[in-house]
UniProtKB/Swiss-Prot annotation:
The gene is H2AC25. The modification N-acetylserine is found at S2. The modification Citrulline is found at R4. Transmembrane segments: none annotated. The modification N6-crotonyllysine is found at K37, K119, K120, K126. The modification N6-lactoyllysine is found at K10. This is Histone H2A type 3.
């Protein structure tokens, strides 16, 4: 009965991406390919791209969360580079991680030196003499 093809065999399971198996949005397969092609080492373990994709996804989510808050504070619904800059520079750990990074169209943090501010004078509501 040759030539009849597969009849009683198991149906092949629907393909499931490594990203969905790991519960991630970032592409594990693409990260794995980039690790292999990037000449970082001769061999790349199966867990390394999953871990790296998870770290990248976490950092991205953290930055976007803070940038979204900055956009909302400025009464905007769209995140622009300025909001990313404000989010990163106002967060101590992200600022340290991305300290040498320049964000195009990001601007600078508003900062006025204390010595340039007008001096505070005593209030005019002093009790007058007898």
């Amino acid at each position: 009965m040759s030539g009849r093809g597969k009849q009683g065999g198991k149906a092949r399971a629907k393909a499931k991406s490594r990203s969905s198996r790991a519960g991630l949005q970032f592409p594990v397969g693409r990260v794995h390919r980039l690790l292999r092609k990037g000449n970082y080492s001769e061999r790349v373990g199966a867990g390394a791209p999953v871990y790296l994709a998870a770290v990248l996804e976490y950092l991205t989510a953290e930055i976007l969360e803070l940038a979204g808050n900055a956009a909302r504070d400025n009464k905007k619904t769209r995140i622009i580079p300025r909001h990313l800059q404000l989010a990163i520079r106002n967060d101590e750990e992200l600022n340290k991680l991305l300290g040498r990074v320049t964000i195009a169209q990001g601007g600078v943090l508003p900062n006025i030196q204390a010595v340039l501010l007008p001096k505070k004078t005593e209030s005019h509501h002093k009790a007058k003499g007898k």
